[in-house]
């Protein structure tokens, strides 16, 4: 899964974003909410955006591209949808609550979670992570980069 979150860390939006939002508010309808022209136009725009993103990320199907309201919702959908009792997950002590809280909850449901500790500088040793892999490890859930 590839997750992109620009809104959380960008103070001011480029003028093009403001113009696109204004245009959407004034002219767009609700996608997939009707057979009238404005709704159909919005639906086409959403589908075209999904198609472009699928191509950009080499995703085989546009319907595999999902839009969510925010990072917490996206992470909850992914984490709760991926793991079940008997699975093993590796994460780190550095993760945001939107990762940690679902993982803690899943531990009460039979999912095993190991956390790689951070050193005093806030770094993890990948060698420590590698020692935690086992046959039932389903994923590593961790931040790749944070600025």
Model-derived segments and spans:
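Pyridoxal 5′-phosphate
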Residues: 1-147
């Amino acid at each position: 899964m590839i997750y992109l979150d620009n809104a959380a860390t960008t103070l001011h939006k480029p003028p093009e974003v403001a113009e696109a939002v204004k245009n959407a508010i004034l002219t767009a309808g609700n996608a997939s909410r009707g057979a009238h022209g404005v709704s159909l136009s919005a639906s086409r725009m959403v589908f075209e955006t999904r198609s472009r993103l699928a191509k950009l990320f080499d995703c085989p199907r546009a319907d595999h591209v999902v839009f969510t309201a925010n990072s917490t919702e996206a992470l909850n959908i992914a984490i709760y949808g991926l793991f079940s009792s008997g699975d093993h997950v590796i994460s780190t002590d550095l993760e945001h609550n939107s990762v940690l809280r679902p993982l803690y909850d899943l531990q009460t449901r039979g999912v095993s979670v190991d956390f790689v500790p951070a050193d005093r500088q806030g770094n993890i040793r990948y060698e420590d992570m590698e020692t935690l892999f086992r046959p039932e490890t389903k994923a590593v859930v961790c931040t790749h980069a944070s600025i």
